[in-house]
C-alpha cells in the first residue's frame, strides 16, 4: 500500500509536531515509503523521528526505517521551554513515561500564562490565560456577561473557570494518584530544552530503533524536476563521514538554517 507524502517538509519545534506530521499524509505525491531521513536533531528532530517510528513500528524488522542525521557543530542550548497541552498526547504516543520525563528534563506543570501589570501597570493588575476552557465554551459568550456585571472585583478567568484559583494557591493540576498524562485541571509543561532533546534521543534509539548519525550534510541530490530549472524531490544526501544516505522521504529539522528547503530548493 502506498502512503501519500510530499518528499520533503520542514518541522520547526512546536507542540503541534504530531499534527504537522499527520497533515503531511495528505500531500499530493504517492510513493511507498520505506526509509525516512531526518536532517537536524534537537527537540524538533527527535519528536518527529519518535512520532514516525512509534506510529510505523520502526523497531520491528518490517517497520519503517528512520534515520536522523545531526551535526556535532551545533551546540545544544539549555533554555527554558514552554509547551502546549497536546505535548502530553505526543509523549504518550511515543511511549514515554511521564514520571521519567519530569525527573530527567527538569519539567514542571504549566497551567497557563499570567501577564502582570496588564492594563494599569499596578502590582495587583494582571491577565490570566488559563489552559482550562471557560464554562460553556462554544455555547455561550460569558465575556459579555462579565463586562455587564456591575462592581466586579474578580478577573474574567476567575469568573469562568477554576484554574486561576489553583495557580494562585500554588497547587498542581493533578494529585500524586492521578494516572500519567491524566489531569484534574488541563496542563502542559515547562522544561529544560537541552535535557529534553537528550531524553528523546535516548528513548528513540533504545526503544524505537531509530538510526542516529552524528555527521554533517555536504551535498543534497535531487531527481530531475519537470522543468530544466526545477529541482525535483530529494533522493539522497551526502555526509562528510558516512557517505551517501538514500531515502524515500526527507524531513528538514535544521531550523533557521533550512538546509533542505531553504538552501537546496531556495
Model-identified regions with their sequence ranges:
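N-terminal Rossmann-like FAD-binding beta1-loop-alpha1 element of flavoenzymes
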Residues: 34-62
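Acidic, Ala/Val/Gly-enriched low-complexity intrinsically disordered segments
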Residues: 2-4, 8-11, 20
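Glycine-rich FAD pyrophosphate-binding loop
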Residues: 54-79
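Flavin (primarily FAD) binding-site architecture
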Residues: 253-266
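A conserved short coil-to-beta-strand element within the FAD-binding core of flavoproteins
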Residues: 213-233
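Helical element adjacent to the flavin cofactor pocket in flavoenzyme catalytic cores
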Residues: 187-217, 241
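Dinucleotide-binding Rossmann-like beta1-alpha1 core, especially the glycine-rich loop
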Residues: 75-167
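Core beta-strand elements of the Rossmann-like FAD/NAD(P) dinucleotide-binding domain
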Residues: 240-249
Amino acid at each position: 500500500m502506498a502512503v501519500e507524502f510530499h518528499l520533503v517538509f520542514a518541522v520547526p519545534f512546536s507542540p503541534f509536531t504530531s499534527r504537522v506530521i499527520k497533515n503531511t499524509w495528505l500531500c499530493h505525491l504517492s510513493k511507498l515509503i520505506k526509509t525516512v531521513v531526518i536532517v537536524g536533531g534537537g527537540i524538533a528532530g527527535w519528536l518527529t523521528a519518535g512520532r514516525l517510528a512509534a506510529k510505523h513500528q520502526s523497531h520491528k524488522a518490517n517497520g519503517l526505517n528512520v534515520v536522523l542525521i545531526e551535526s556535532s557543530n551545533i551546540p545544544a542550548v539549555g533554555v527554558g521551554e514552554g509547551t502546549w497541552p497536546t505535548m502530553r498526547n505526543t509523549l504518550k504516543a511515543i511511549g514515554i513515561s511521564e514520571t521519567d520525563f519530569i525527573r530527567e528534563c527538569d519539567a514542571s506543570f504549566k497551567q497557563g500564562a499570567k501577564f502582570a501589570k496588564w492594563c494599569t501597570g499596578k502590582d495587583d493588575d494582571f491577565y490570566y490565560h488559563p489552559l482550562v476552557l471557560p464554562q460553556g465554551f462554544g455555547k455561550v459568550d460569558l465575556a459579555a456577561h462579565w463586562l455587564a456585571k456591575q462592581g466586579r472585583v474578580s478577573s474574567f478567568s476567575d469568573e469562568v473557570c477554576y484554574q486561576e484559583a489553583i495557580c494562585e494557591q500554588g497547587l498542581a493540576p493533578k494529585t500524586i494518584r492521578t494516572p500519567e498524562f491524566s489531569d484534574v485541571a488541563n496542563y502542559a509543561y515547562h522544561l529544560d530544552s537541552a535535557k529534553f532533546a537528550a531524553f528523546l534521543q535516548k528513548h528513540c534509539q533504545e526503544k524505537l530503533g531509530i538510526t542516529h548519525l552524528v555527521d554533517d550534510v555536504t551535498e543534497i541530490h535531487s531527481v530531475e524536476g519537470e522543468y530544466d530549472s526545477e529541482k525535483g524531490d530529494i533522493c539522497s544526501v551526502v555526509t562528510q563521514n558516512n557517505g551517501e544516505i538514500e531515502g524515500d522521504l526527507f524531513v528538514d529539522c535544521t531550523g533557521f538554517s533550512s538546509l533542505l528547503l531553504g538552501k537546496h530548493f531556495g
